[in-house]
């Protein structure tokens, strides 16, 4: 027998009361986005399950994709069949025969939500267990911790049989907690911050600053590939490329070297906030980790934050670098992040950046710039690309070859 579908059990959605169906419908849409590379599948949801019909598609890549989607508590490959006792008996016998090995223990666990069905749960357990013994007389039944728990569900529309339960990613469906702008540089930290924001249901749009010719097409492709990795957790992501060359050259030419990083980050924050307002976001997300670099001391954060009243979420702020690296490896962004392309934060980095910049000094140096004009020109020049979870090469070099 081949699996008919993957049955998805919802996570925290069971606690969402009157908003439950909104959360479930969002999860359904996210699953459809993530499974877009598999055109034969079909997705439908009810109040306590989402059903992914395979329609002949190999179940294994579908399971691997669904395991990453936030809002999924658990999933099971299942056999779907008509609610017929003879069909159930045959299916259970075939499944257990295919699984059998010497010493195998099992139990039947039946759940009947269709109370009009001819047998109740206890009667079905007895009947189906007996059917297994007919074809496997040496198998052993065991009620506690058996090797195989064969789950049989009798629902209104059909009967379902499964024996695997695979842990999902948990969290909330992406998009159920509002929208935020993720400042993604291309380093290790910001993709991890984006992943953690996605886990709590935040719909992120990626803001990436590009300064050609100082930053290369490879750096842009790298940032887009990192964004593509993040789409596996909740579907399509809007990638916003911001032209930043003019601003960086202005800062380089007119500001003291010690304040280059502070002023650069203040402009980035202003621009991200303007894009957030334009695109109806609620928060800004970044990958700052307290004390990790000069721009991430409390004094630096205070001086940079002063340009906006928008909430700033820093998911990795208390994490050690090694913890961030481990998470980046777990979510498969690390190998991309360490590709050797310079980003806007590194091309003009001073040898001795100010670790305790004074807000008054930053504001004084900014009097040398046409702040509103620079920000407006940057925002008006953005390029928005929708990044989808299509199948791509693992290596950034292959992406660069396609650009050349």
Swiss-Prot record:
Residues where ATP binds: 183-184, 208-209, 265, 287, 296
A GO MF term: ATP binding
GO BP terms: thiamine biosynthetic process; thiamine diphosphate biosynthetic process; thiazole biosynthetic process; tRNA 4-thiouridine biosynthesis
GO cellular component: cytosol
E.C. number: 2.8.1.4
CDD domains (UniProt xref): PPase_ThiI (cd01712), THUMP_ThiI (cd11716)
Domain of life per record: Bacteria
Residue ranges of domain THUMP in the record: 60-165
Reaction it catalyzes: [ThiI sulfur-carrier protein]-S-sulfanyl-L-cysteine + a uridine in tRNA + 2 reduced [2Fe-2S]-[ferredoxin] + ATP + H(+) = [ThiI sulfur-carrier protein]-L-cysteine + a 4-thiouridine in tRNA + 2 oxidized [2Fe-2S]-[ferredoxin] + AMP + diphosphate; [ThiS sulfur-carrier protein]-C-terminal Gly-Gly-AMP + S-sulfanyl-L-cysteinyl-[cysteine desulfurase] + AH2 = [ThiS sulfur-carrier protein]-C-terminal-Gly-aminoethanethioate + L-cysteinyl-[cysteine desulfurase] + A + AMP + 2 H(+)
Entry keyword annotation includes Ribosomal protein: no
Location in or out of the cell: Cytoplasm
PANTHER family attached to this UniProt entry: TRNA SULFURTRANSFERASE
Family as reported in the entry's similarity comment: Belongs to the ThiI family.
NCBIfam families registered for this protein in UniProt: tRNA uracil 4-sulfurtransferase ThiI
Function: Catalyzes the ATP-dependent transfer of a sulfur to tRNA to produce 4-thiouridine in position 8 of tRNAs, which functions as a near-UV photosensor. Also catalyzes the transfer of sulfur to the sulfur carrier protein ThiS, forming ThiS-thiocarboxylate. This is a step in the synthesis of thiazole, in the thiamine biosynthesis pathway. The sulfur is donated as persulfide by IscS.
Protein name (Swiss-Prot/TrEMBL): Probable tRNA sulfurtransferase
UniProt organism field: Streptococcus pyogenes serotype M12 (strain MGAS2096)
Taxonomy of the source species: Bacteria, Bacillati, Bacillota, Bacilli, Lactobacillales
């Amino acid at each position: 027998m081949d699996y008919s579908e993957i049955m998805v059990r919802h996570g925290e959605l069971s606690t969402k009361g009157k908003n439950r169906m909104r959360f479930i419908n969002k999860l359904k849409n996210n699953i459809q986005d993530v499974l877009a590379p598999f055109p034969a599948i079909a997705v439908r949801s009810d109040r306590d399950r989402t059903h992914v019909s395979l329609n002949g598609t190999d179940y294994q890549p579908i399971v691997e994709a669904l395991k990453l989607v936030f809002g999924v508590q658990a999933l099971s490959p299942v056999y779907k069949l008509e609610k017929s006792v003879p069909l159930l008996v045959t299916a259970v016998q075939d499944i257990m025969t295919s699984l059998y090995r010497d010493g195998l223990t099992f139990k039947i666990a039946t759940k009947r939500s269709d109370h009009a069905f001819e047998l109740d749960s206890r009667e079905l357990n007895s009947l189906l267990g007996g059917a297994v013994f007919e074809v496997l007389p040496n198998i052993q039944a065991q009620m506690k911790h058996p090797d195989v728990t064969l789950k049989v569900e009798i629902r209104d529309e059909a009967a379902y049989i499964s024996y695997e339960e695979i842990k999902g990613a948990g969290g909330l469906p992406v998009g159920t907690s509002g929208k935020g702008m993720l400042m993604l540089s291309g380093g290790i930290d910001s993709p991890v911050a984006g992943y953690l924001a996605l886990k709590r249901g935040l719909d992120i749009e990626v803001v990436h600053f590009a300064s050609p010719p100082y930053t290369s097409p490879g750096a842009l492709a790298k940032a887009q590939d990192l964004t593509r990795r993040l789409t596996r957790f909740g579907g399509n992501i809007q990638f916003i490329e911001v032209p930043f060359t003019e601003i960086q050259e202005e800062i380089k030419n007119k500001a003291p070297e010690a304040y280059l990083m502070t002023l650069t980050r203040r402009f980035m924050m202003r621009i991200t906030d303007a894009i957030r307002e334009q695109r109806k976001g609620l928060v800004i997300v970044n990958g700052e980790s307290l004390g990790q670099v000069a721009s991430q001391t409390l004094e630096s954060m205070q001086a940079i934050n002063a340009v906006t009243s928008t909430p700033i979420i820093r998911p990795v702020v208390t994490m050690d670098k090694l913890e961030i690296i481990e998470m980046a490896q777990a979510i498969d962004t690390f190998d991309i992040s360490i590709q050797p392309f310079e980003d806007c934060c590194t091309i003009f980095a001073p040898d001795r950046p100010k670790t305790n910049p004074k807000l008054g000094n930053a504001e004084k140096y900014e009097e040398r710039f046409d702040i509103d004009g620079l920000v407006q020109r940057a925002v008006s020049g953005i390029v928005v690309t929708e990044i989808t979870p299509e199948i791509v090469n693992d290596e950034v070099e292959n992406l660069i070859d396609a650009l050349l």
